[in-house]
Design a protein with these regions (language model features):
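Long, C-terminal-biased catalytic regions of enzyme "large/alpha" subunits
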Residues: 1-177
């Protein structure tokens, strides 16, 4: 799939993170996917749904369980939501954006009520500490960050899955090679 490799071989993943020269990362889907879906007769709206399933919405606006409304109810203001959203674009998981470095230590202590000790703990999970369950975090994560696979994508016919097989399993839920 595609020519992003050094020879004729399966690509290693459908969705990749490209490191930017100025810092940060950019999430990109294999550019052959939309072309292949078009060639197989999928409508543009279906293709967009499949791509969004793979790479995510890259926002928590409209996400299930963890979204701007629920975060406002936990103490987030517009400035904090803006800082959070700017980090979600390159996030592999939403939990990586919920930290004192993104939100600001003062905000985390004064607005959210966390202690210095909590924020200093390397394994501190801010989303769990805010009261979200693992299932809620997973659902919001899939919405925002995507699945990184076409397996289970809306509209995609099972007989078309082999077209998108890679050298590795793709994403957390991928089973195919």
């Amino acid at each position: 799939m595609d020519c992003d490799t050094t020879g004729i071989e399966p690509d290693f993943a459908l969705v990749k993170f490209k490191k930017l020269a100025g810092g940060g990362y950019f999430k990109i889907i294999n550019q052959s996917i939309p072309q292949a879906l078009t060639a197989m007769g999928y409508a543009e709206s279906q293709i967009q749904d499949i791509i969004r399933y793979c790479v995510g919405a890259q926002t928590l606006k409209g996400a299930p369980f963890i979204n701007h409304e629920t975060l406002r109810n936990k103490g987030f203001d517009d400035a904090a939501l803006e800082r959070l959203e700017s980090n979600l674009i390159q996030a592999f998981e939403i939990a990586f954006a919920f930290n004192k470095f993104t939100l600001g230590e003062t905000f985390c202590i004064e607005q959210l009520g966390f202690s210095d000790a909590q924020l200093a703990e390397p394994n501190f999970n801010m989303l769990k500490a805010l009261g979200f369950t693992q299932e809620e975090i997973a659902a919001a994560n899939e919405y925002c960050c995507g699945t990184m696979t076409v397996e289970g994508a809306p509209h995609l016919k099972a007989e078309h899955l082999p077209v998108f097989d890679c050298a590795n399993r793709c994403g957390r839920i991928g089973q195919r090679f």
